[in-house]
Design a protein with these regions (language model features):
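Acidic, Ser/Thr/Pro
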Residues: 1-101
Length: 101
């Protein structure tokens, strides 16, 4: 599965704000869960399928977090079977100062 990935050190209550050009799955995962996700295994995450943007996910605890965006399972558009253009942005709204632990 193809996906966009970004790893960030985030603090509790920071907000991950996603803009996307189409319906997508957004996951906020720990390193261990991201490894499982990459390998097709069971994983837990914060987020889900979003069709309204900006999507906002609050960070549950301070640490390193993996943000993924994918459009798995989305249908081709009606323009001759071509895929729609996928654009996205990931912004972090810091509610506290960054502290590497």
């Amino acid at each position: 599965m193809k996906f966009v990935h970004q790893r960030e050190h985030l603090n509790e209550d920071d907000l991950v704000v996603i803009e996307c050009s189409q319906l997508c799955n957004i996951r906020l995962m720990s390193d261990a869960n991201f490894r499982s996700f990459k390998n097709g295994g069971r994983h837990t995450y914060h987020g889900g399928a979003f069709d309204r943007f900006p999507a906002k996910i609050a960070v549950p605890s301070t640490g390193f977090w993996n943000i993924t965006i994918d459009t798995a399972g989305r249908k081709l558009d009606s323009h001759g079977g071509r895929k729609t253009t996928f654009t996205h942005s990931i912004k972090i709204v810091r509610r506290t100062s960054t502290r590497l632990s």
